[in-house]
């Protein structure tokens, strides 16, 4: 079995620079020296859960100059937490959510500008977003509709 990976992505600050990565791995049938590595990598793949299971809620906030999204989610005590967001298609380039305030009482709050949408998309229209929550060695993926 030959595994091939090609990934197109962008590194963004003020300007997005496209990049590409490729990797290939050939696996022989049966046990392999790579089994442990593959199992470890598979364990790190985000597991899909519901918004309720992740304790995640997302809502629009329109008090500032730009529309923002505020995200509340369950946060295990004593563990760092990261949040990433994707739009419904690869044409979306949403910013990385930033912590709105330090996690406390089992809750974390993040926010991000509703920016990086494809041309012609209304920032006020409903949209399906995918959130990836990373805490320690665990990652989950949550699909949520922003009305």
Q: PLM features: residue spans?
A:
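Structural recognition of alpha-helix starts/caps
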Residues: 1-147
């Amino acid at each position: 079995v030959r595994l091939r990976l090609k990934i197109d992505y962008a590194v963004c600050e003020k300007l997005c620079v496209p990049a590409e990565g490729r990797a290939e791995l050939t696996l022989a049938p049966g046990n392999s020296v790579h089994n442990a590595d593959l199992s470890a990598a598979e364990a790190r793949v985000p597991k899909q859960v519901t918004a309720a299971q992740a304790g995640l809620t997302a809502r629009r906030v329109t008090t500032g100059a730009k529309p923002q999204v505020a995200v509340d989610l369950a946060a295990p005590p004593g563990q760092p937490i990261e949040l990433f967001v994707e739009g419904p298609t690869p044409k979306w380039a949403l910013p990385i959510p930033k912590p709105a305030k330090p996690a406390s009482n089992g809750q974390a709050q993040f926010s991000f500008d509703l920016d990086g949408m494809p041309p012609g998309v209304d920032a006020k229209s409903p949209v399906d977003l995918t959130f990836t929550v990373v805490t320690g060695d665990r990652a989950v993926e949550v699909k949520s509709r922003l009305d």
